[in-house]
Design a protein with these regions (language model features):
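Histidine- and aromatic-rich ligand-binding microenvironments
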Residues: 21-23, 30-37, 44-45, 49-51, ...
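Short, well-structured active-site flanking segments
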Residues: 9-28, 99-127, 172-177
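Flexible glycine/proline-enriched surface loops and loop-helix/loop-strand junctions
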Residues: 73-78, 89, 138-147
Length: 271
């Protein structure tokens, strides 16, 4: 999601899309899509979706997914609520394709990955694309089930991407600040490091113990979970990406936070 957000915000940077202009033929804006405030549902709510994935079926077409979900029907008025929605990011992908006149993978590569120096990341589009990956039990998984796209590559590339993005190597300061302006989503989450979790424009952001703020993203994929976060302390910063098989978001987040705090502490001692 962060890669899609960075790509979409590069369109805003270049004056090709307005962050707060309604998307064509819709009531919501790009900002609302990016921050999950557009009123859309999520295909993860469909029991049939999870059953089909578990049975190693071929992915439905995007049109069939939207029909099964009733995805065009808003669940609340845009801007008045919050609901995590992969459908929103699927629509962001379509917006990127329409504005750039490029396939999504080419647009993301040209506008986000290549400018940030990433050369070992690609979209998985077929089952064969996952054969040499370390994503847990993926031998029969169809990556087309991820309707907004499934990026794969070395875990180090995820850390490099986030670190360079948040260091300002792609977006101007004002737009980067917009990206990191988060909607607070309640209080502490049991089993996870967040004290005040929040969501910005394609990034999870919030405070953790010690008064530090994390910015990045956690995500569950086929048979695995990844967390990549950046933390700052004055002029010092650290970025870490972690991966493990299974589906425990809290466990991988705890590991990443531990590594980040150790890195900051070592930096302070060296100073």
């Amino acid at each position: 999601k962060t890669a899609l957000a960075a790509t979409a915000l590069s369109l805003v940077r270049d004056g090709l899309v307005g962050l707060d202009d309604p998307i064509r033929d819709q009531l919501f804006t790009l900002r609302q899509l990016l921050r999950h405030e557009a009123g859309l549902a999520d295909y993860g709510e469909l029991a049939d979706y999870h059953a089909a994935v578990a049975n190693h079926e071929a992915a439905w077409s995007a049109d069939e997914m939207m029909q099964r979900l009733g995805g065009a029907r808003l669940r609340y008025s845009p801007g008045t609520g919050w609901r995590y929605s992969n459908v929103g990011y699927f629509l962001i992908g379509r917006l990127i394709e329409r504005v750039t006149d490029l396939a999504l993978e080419e647009a993301v590569s040209r506008r986000a990955l290549t400018p940030l120096g990433l050369s070992r990341v690609r979209f998985a589009k077929t089952r064969a694309d996952l054969q040499n990956s370390h994503l847990g039990n993926t031998s029969n998984y169809d990556p087309a089930w991820v309707y907004h796209g499934l990026l794969i590559g070395p875990i180090s590339q995820a850390a490099l991407f986030l670190d360079r993005l948040l260091a300002g190597h792609l977006l101007p300061p004002g737009l980067l600040q917009e990206m990191q302006t988060a909607k607070t989503l309640g209080g502490p989450i049991p089993g996870r490091p967040w004290i005040t979790p929040g969501y910005g424009l394609g990034v999870m952001q919030g405070s953790i113990e010690g008064g530090f703020t994390l910015c990045g993203h956690t995500g569950c994929g086929p048979g695995s979970v990844i967390a990549v976060y950046r933390i700052c302390d004055g002029n010092a910063s650290a970025c870490c990406a972690g991966f493990e098989t299974g589906a425990s978001e809290g466990a991988i987040e705890a590991l990443v936070v531990q590594k980040l705090m150790q890195t900051l502490q070592l930096g302070a001692e060296d100073a």
